[in-house]
Amino acid sequence: LHADLLPHDRAVGSNRDFLALRHDHNLTRGWTGRLNVQRASDDNYFRDLSTRVVDTSTTNLPRDGELRYGNENWIFSTRVLSYQTLQDPDPTKRIEIPYRLRPQLLLLGNKPGYYGADLNLESELTQFDHPSKTNGQRLLIYPSLSYPMANNFSFVTPKLGYHYTRYKLTDNFSGDSQLTRGMPIFSVDSGL
């Protein structure tokens, strides 16, 4: 926890503060949680009160939370992310507000050595929103199968997978509210 407080700053006529809470926690076997929440009282807080360039150029303060489970074959996580955007005082230099993730669900699977093959799964479901842009949901699924073959002097690993992505959009200005893409992927990794 980090907190700064400047009571009744005469230059602006109000209290000014900055708060940063960062916490990583091992909950139970395989489960972890993480928080990174930051806030500033006003857009000019760092420009007025910091002497470090890294602080004075800060524009987005994260508000990020994640709950994760993992074992030797699976990882599952759920995450929410938004930002406090500190605007430039010059109205011609407005800073674009980033998208919020509410929530982002992730499932990764890996089963090496399954009858000689390695099975993998990457999947993600994300609800993203923005106050003035297209909002929506993205689904990504990428299962793959690879078959590593090696001897003392070389290796060859063919891999076959299918990458599927679906977007379901609202407030979409292009007209299409549902977009999908599926692509088979084949690769070979080899070496001596």
How would you name each of these model-derived features?
Residues 1-192:
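Outer-membrane beta-barrel proteins and related beta-barrel translocases across Gram-negative bacteria
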